[in-house]
Amino acid sequence: MSFLEEHYGIRRNLILDRLEFMPYTPSADAGKGYRPMRGKDYNTMFVDLQMAGVSCYQNFLRAVIDSNYAKEFNPYTDYLYALPPWDGTDYIAQLADTLTTENRELWQKGFKRWIVGLVACALSDEDMNQLVIILYSEQGKGKSSWIRRLLPPEWKEYFYNGIIDPSNKDDARLLATRIIINMEEFEGVKPGELAALKRIIAQDNVTQRKAYDIEAFTLPRHCSFIASTNNRQCLQDIGGNRRFLPITITGIDYH
């Protein structure tokens, strides 16, 4: 145990439900930060132990690492709680104003509600963000780039771009392992598909079973949905539903 503590940082990512490690000793991989544990990484640790004269079985090493020995890590709380105290500036309004829209008041109120819901959903296992913003403009305005920039670099891995299929197990898992799902090139939904989309937006957890686990486990939903489209018609198709906020963009300021 002392050898591992001296040479490696080992943690369990609570959002991605995976083990991650970082070597402390000088090597080609040192300084790259934490990364997922792969089979070769277990093997490397085992070889390091043997070369250091520490005798143990390889399955015991795996058991130690994949246990409560690994400290818990939440990327959302780790980042947010390290930020400086709020200075009173309305940064949400400033961020919202980087988009010029046809109805500024509606956009300001809607975006504040959505971004506050995003943070609450990320931090809490109980809160859900059931509002979906749909950004419309002509092609080439940079909607997807603007959406990506909503997240800090530390959360890059927790962004998903694309339409999800709730019947697909891997897609359903994204509800728990991503903070933003951007339904890029959203073309609206057929009348029969709207109910299914609303169920996804309101879903509060994902229940699955890994191949090597004994029982199924439940992961809380942490994602918020946003969509971008070049099709004005889809705004009319989805309009009138309280879960969706269609916004027409006339300009984007990246500065």
Regions picked out by a protein language model, each given a short descriptive name:
Residues 235-254:
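A short helix-turn-beta junction within AAA+ P-loop NTPase domains corresponding to the substrate/partner-engaging
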Residues 194-217:
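Conserved catalytic/switch belt of AAA+ P-loop NTPases
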Residues 67-176:
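P-loop NTPase catalytic core of nucleic-acid-dependent motor ATPases
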Residues 1-91, 102-105, 109:
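N-terminal nucleic-acid engagement/recognition segments and initiation subdomains in replication
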Residues 179-202, 235-241:
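Conserved AAA+/SF3 P-loop NTPase catalytic/coupling segment centered on the Walker-B
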Residues 170-176, 210-228:
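AAA+/SF3 P-loop NTPase mechanochemical coupling elements
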Residues 230-233:
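Short, polar loop motifs at secondary-structure junctions
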Residues 177-179, 204, 221-224, 239-245:
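Short glycine-/polar-rich loops that comprise or flank the Walker A/P-loop
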